[in-house]
């Protein structure tokens, strides 16, 4: 969703029509404060992380949380909102209008062509993936989510990933304990 949001943002800027619309991003891949912060920084006026809301709602309904569905959703909404405000504060930005579209982040691991075409003006000191690499990542995730062999009972256990911090069942990293 970030690639698409930034792409639309820059297309509208190049056509000098950006101020004529507001982008509302409804995305299933948004699950963390950082994701919301990036989407707003790259042009989104509002973000609806629908899959995160549905997941929290299911967890509350199934008794995995100590609060009801409405409270769980309100808690997530509050956490995302206050988290974005905290990020803005640390960057010295006091209004959402100043933050939206400001691109105050540095890209890590995207090649120059992707930066130039889709994240124009974003600082990037470490190059890496191109569009083909990103497409393959999406295809891999799709194959995992929708395997060819369907089982009678849907799986309920999702991988934790361990992308940001060590997890016993997460990916292996050089600095694991």
Language-model segments: which ranges?
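Catalytic-face loop-and-helix region of soluble metabolic enzyme cores
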Residues: 14-17, 55-69
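Flexible, glycine-rich loop/tail regions that form catalytic "lids" or insertion modules at the edges
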Residues: 35-36, 46-51, 63-177
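Beta-strand segments within the central parallel beta-sheet cores of soluble alpha/beta enzyme folds
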Residues: 20-28, 98-102
